[in-house]
Amino acid sequence: MKGNEIRSRFLEYFKGNGHTVAESSSLVPKDDPTLLFTNAGMVQFKRVFMGDDKRGYVRAVTSQKCVRAGGKHNDLENVGYTARHHTFFEMLGNFSFGDYFKEEAIRLAWNFLTVELGLPAEKMWVSVFEDDDEAFALWEKVEDLPKGRIVRLGEKDNFWAMGDTGPCGPCSEIHIDQGVGSSPCDNPNCAVGCDCDRFLELWNLVFMQFNRAEDGSLTALPRPSIDTGMGLERVAAVLQGKFNNYDSDLFAPIIAVLEDISGVKYGAAADTDTAIRVIADHARATSFLVADGVLPSNEGRGYVLRRIMRRAVRYGKKLGLEKPFMDRVTKAVCAEMQNAYPQLVATAALLEKVVNNEEERFRETLEHGLVQLDEKISQLLTSGGDAVIDGPFIFKLYDTFGFPFDIVRDIALERGVGFDEAGFATAMAEQRAKSRASRKGEGVKLHDEGVKALADAGKKAEFLGYEGLEADSVVEGLLSEQGSGVEKLVAGEKGRVFVAATPFYAEAGGQMGDRGSVRWQGGQASVYATQAEGTGLILHDLLVEEGELSLGLEVTLQVDDEERKATASNHSATHLLQAALISVLGDHVKQSGSLVGPERLRFDFTNFSQLTAAEIAQVETLVNEQIRNNAVIATDVLSKQEAIAGGATALFGEKYDDDVRVVSMGDYSRELCGGTHVGATGEIGLFVILSESGIAAGVRRIEALTGRAALAYVQGRLSTGNELADLLSCKSGDLVPKVESLLTAVKEGEKRVAQLAGQLASSGLDDLLNNALTVAGIKVVVAEVPLENAKALRELGDKVRDNLESGIAVIGGAVGGKVALLAIVTKDLVDRIQAGRIVSEVSGIVGGKGGGRPDMAQAGGTMPDKLSEAIASVPAIIEAML
């Protein structure tokens, strides 16, 4: 059975058993700072299991994209060397949120494996937690599970916990006996629980029934849940009679491409087999990480991706691949998996650019780094001491050549030397500490005690700002400027206020929070920021200008009308801008960030090259065309699945509720967005791009203006153009050719001036030579000459040298408020006196220094008023040196 069929059967089977098919979440977890990547099917349901979130269903089934590389769950160093380790894999899982429990989970899993997939029951084994008598008894009731096939194991193997505290529970694993000889094993008592692959774990059923307190005690959860996981790659290999995941059909097309481009046959040799497996795996991880918005960088998720990509390139060298090849391999990944994951098609162009750019950049430094590493290892192996690559050296390779630690480790293991991982980590930590220190002072959002108290009290605000800009409400919470709860704020004090309902939009989704005022009988305050805290809290940062603001007071909240309109205009323009960028550059364009305020907008997006002037103009034109179309901007609340299916654009990594707000601008733009917008595109008025720049590898930034700000900018540019036209006595439309003509004339004039200066300096050559002095029997030419530039002095010096058969010359002049000196000694005299010594001595008088060859030397100085004195001293200086 093919891997794609297994995936489809799994989803359809559980759908037929009352489960909702939930789409795979992004590899970038939205609300879990403890994880670099989504590494299990339950990650997207973590808040559901903890009771902090609810879904519109109690049964779910997924085929979840997972990455285990970096952080606690890191399989990177094992990839390629074992039959089962991957950086990227798919986890098939079914989930129950307080619905069915152990008996149903066991029944569903057993039936799928033995009936749907046809795996032989006689080869199956089951493990349960040693104290889970309930699960043991339920498995004993499974009629076609052979007797004696249930094994009790300890907490290490069969008890699962989300963390040190929180939901946890025993688990039951289903294993298949692949037979003697299926996996190397030296244990004569090999059985379920052995580290070899003979008794291969297929499926893990987690019974979340307890909550673990900080003291380690367990209490029963009111609504026990189910979380299961089965690796698609693993079950595909088993069904296809393979003992290695990489031998299944999921990898075959990728390996075939590698065989084609390298000329190396898979299965020919152990070392090249390892390289092929590494590249095949890493190409899958690269393809899906880029598709989910991760780009190579030097920190966080981007650094893990860079490590994966560069490790693949390095293993490519083992296959003789000296030219870029990863693009062809990732294309094979996309071709194989695009039906199950259509986003691979949408991001194909971006993936191609990312892969080619990263591989080319790394290849530029790879050879240099490999040479240094090889020299280091050779030195260690011949030194007779401990053959350990020191941490600072490994860090130097990382910092200078972009060598991830993994590459150094792999090569060290291959060459039989040690590596100082702790020393490398220390050097890395020191660098990060310096980086953090340099960023000291950047703003940090604090969740203080007052905010926590409001959240714990279940406070939530109703947002009324879509319908109007003014609303009456009641003060339900007050915080001091320091963040603690207070009863009142008086005139002159800053603080934060929470009300039951507000028209103020809280900063979110890149849109700045509203500003405005709060009024009450006998007082008022100015709101200078609005922020969202926790779940549902909207806090107004304000300054009390008059009166006393206290709890329970009835107030009127008024959003600044002009600022809201300007912000809405800029926000709507960012939607049009993204659509225009996709139209001009391609579907790889994805939003990477934005900042929308009343003054201007900033939009960050993925693209691996600078936009040309023509592309910028085209984008600007497209946006303004949509503004002139004056399309109605409509908002609808739809299910997330319905919105995405309808073509709505979602922000990578953003977590959305099951019901989402969709903002549509005619047929041109359709995005998931909770921000505020104008009523029709025509209200934007005008759109002008101020700048386009790069902010990171593969990320560009556009800053732009709309409405009145854009008009003022254009008027300012026109005014400046008119002033320049008046100054140059031409029409505004002729400014460019007029300026080009003037620049050409200036350059020609400068060239002519330089020529004349050279001629003027050279014209006195005969006079210089005829007026030469004699010092100790040697002809000495000494002169102070007018100079246009330093080049004129060198040209004069060349002519003096060519015409001075035997002698010394020292020439000086003032250029741009500084002194330029030149000394020449003919070759027959350099054994007696050197030009460098002469010019060094003379330049000291004019506050400078210099040097050069024995026959010619130059110097500079900062005291042109001392030049005559310096020139006059030359004969005495030469006489003293002879």
Curated annotation (Swiss-Prot):
Belongs to the class-II aminoacyl-tRNA synthetase family. GO terms for molecular function: alanine-tRNA ligase activity; aminoacyl-tRNA deacylase activity; ATP binding; tRNA binding; zinc ion binding. InterPro entries: aa-tRNA-synth_II/BPL/LPL (IPR045864), Ala-tRNA-lgiase_IIc (IPR002318), Ala-tRNA-ligase_IIc_anticod-bd (IPR018162), Ala-tRNA-synth_IIc_core (IPR018165), Ala-tRNA-synth_IIc_N (IPR018164), Ala-tRNA_ligase (IPR050058), Ala_tRNA_ligase_euk/bac (IPR023033), DHHA1_dom (IPR003156). It comes from Desulfotalea psychrophila (strain LSv54 / DSM 12343). It catalyses: tRNA(Ala) + L-alanine + ATP = L-alanyl-tRNA(Ala) + AMP + diphosphate. The gene is alaS. This is Alanine--tRNA ligase. GO terms for cellular component: cytosol. It comes from the Bacteria. It is found in: Cytoplasm.
